């Protein structure tokens, strides 16, 4: 049985396809309703849909929330934490805050982990079946009530400064800004992921003679924003 991890950034889909080509059948995972989760602070819970698109494979789904550094217990629970989902079925995960200390003047980022484990079909010969355990990590943003500004337009408020071979990005808003692309004179900065609220991030420049920065962000719904540009 093999484990495949997927996250918020781009994943190597060619590798997954290549694995499947070595077998006559490949048992894959479940479908999650969304690429990120927004938890409004004035809500008692949020729900995420889980669907099993397989025609004959039963899966066991395990879910939990964790902090990014994995050193502290996240103040959220997921119910049901473990359940069976039959082919063609859809179920809902309920995420509930259990307390804890989170910032009230800005967003906090956590992770929703969803692992799908396909059941072994005893009626099928196992020498031609690749069982894939798929673990997905979705960003979970806790958004306190009463934050100023519009999260949809937060990416427009970023400011950029060139310091030698480094690009500094400042975010004055209380919202995380997650990049879809960040380019300098048309050259993408592949390590650019996000800028924390009321914080900054630094990335290496592909060229020290850069003059124009262009970027797009990922919004609450997983969509891509319009491109913004600034002169350095």
Predicted regions: what they are:
Residues 55-61, 105, 174-179:
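Short acidic/proline- and small/hydrophobic-mixed sequence motifs that coincide with surface turns
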Residues 23-25:
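N-terminal signal peptide c-region/cleavage motif recognized by signal peptidases
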Residues 2-15:
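Bacterial N-terminal signal peptides that target proteins for export
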Residues 31, 49-95:
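Surface-exposed binding patches on compact interaction domains or structured appendages
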Residues 100-147, 211-232:
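Terminal connector regions
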Residues 28-51, 150-159:
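Beta-sheet-dominated interaction scaffolds and their linkers
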Residues 74-101, 187-211:
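Intrinsically disordered, low-complexity Pro/Gly/Ser/Thr-rich segments with frequent PxxP/GP/PP motifs
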Residues 50-54, 167-173:
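Asparagine-centered strand-capping/turn motif at beta-strand->loop junctions
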